[in-house]
């Protein structure tokens, strides 16, 4: 922990005042209070690590292992069961669906055939447990924003063959930038006074909740952590098997960058360790180089495989000092700061940590309604086991780029504007602006733009086939 000796007198006083104020916040546990003060102390001591650009090396295939070089899997179902008995699946479930106009946890947005993200996750694990006679548990890490709703939602899975456990990530007070006081002490006692400190918090929260010890007692060895909105983040035994054989304590799945991913974090070799390099850590003069697909060819999918005993060892030693991400916000006109950490940045603290360079199919996030259009279309199919699989009929390995105007931003509006989702198997790009409505059975091919003039409602008729066209009015269809 940052002590007064590493701080200027002014910062030491700031931290002491903050300690006194936080001590009186009864909404949070002692673990949360000390975790928060620890984080702020590190932030004030300015321990942010500066990257020496000349020391960055491209990781070798030993460090970032190509997927096809992973150890081969046994075909024996008994061996598969042995592997699965060591596994826990953890989904990061702290996010709300607000950016897509939904209330409640993002994981309950319907993805396809009336099934939500959470329904699909449960189906997948149910199928594994049934097929191999194993018992892979599902853990959901909620935030205080999603906890109550999630408890109600998981009741519907009471009859499934899965143990579902929920726990909360930490709840920290937002800091008022002006005087470094906790926002809840300023009379803002509602949810706006607090924040969840990023998914780097998964490790201490797993420990503090008691879940980590309970899992270790059941003989579990590895946790597969992924965002609940990544439809490609399914259990992969090849990765798990490789980690167990090679005693790798941590594995980050990376995949080749496309132009859409230039801001994503990448893995580098730095002073003999593999570590995550995020755009925020890159000196200004090197940002364009960081974004180049030539030099930094891979990016972090946030699918992580981590050894449970190693998490316990490092959390107990207070060794997981990930880079702090300062996230400035404004609440009711008051400038506040929230300090966060990312789970991927923990890679450098684990022994024999590696990356696995996986196929792009393992990264299928739904961040906006444009992504929802992709996964609800004929570009993908849904299997009985809950897997969203790309349609082999599409010859182009990359997905079409889709830009929808603000009229489509909310899920309800998006669904209302499509009588049915168009066929996009041969689409390269789609850009839609203005008050546009799609009929049923529409087919889009090549490069298509649809732009309704201001104040004009533009309807694409049922059954229309539009190939390589710019449509600005009914006469263009």
Curated annotation (Swiss-Prot):
Gene Ontology cellular-component terms for this entry are: cytoplasm
Reaction(s) this enzyme catalyzes, per UniProt: alpha-D-glucose 1-phosphate + UTP + H(+) = UDP-alpha-D-glucose + diphosphate
Q: Where does substrate bind?
A: 94-95, 199, 227-229
Q: Which InterPro entries has this protein been placed in?
A: Nucleotide-diphossugar_trans (IPR029044), UDPGP_fam (IPR002618), UDPGP_trans (IPR016267)
Describe regulators of its activity.
Answer: Inhibition by uncomplexed, free UTP.
Q: Where is the signal peptide?
A: none
Please list the GO biological process terms of this entry: glycogen metabolic process; UDP-alpha-D-glucose metabolic process
- Compartment(s) of residence: Cytoplasm
Q: What is its EC number?
A: 2.7.7.9
What happens after mutating residue 367 to Q? Almost complete loss of activity
The main enzyme category here is transferase
Q: Specify which residues bind UTP according to the UniProt entry for this protein.
A: 92-95, 106, 169, 198, 229, 367
Query: What's the superkingdom here?
Result: Eukaryota
* Cofactor (UniProt): Mg(2+)
List-wise, which residues carry N-acetylalanine?
A: 2
- Single Gene Ontology MF annotation: UTP:glucose-1-phosphate uridylyltransferase activity
The residues that cross the membrane are none
Q: What does this protein do?
A: Plays a central role as a glucosyl donor in cellular metabolic pathways.
Q: What subunit structure does UniProt give?
A: Monomer.
Q: Which family does it belong to?
A: Belongs to the UDPGP type 1 family.
Q: Could you tell me what this protein is called? A: UTP--glucose-1-phosphate uridylyltransferase
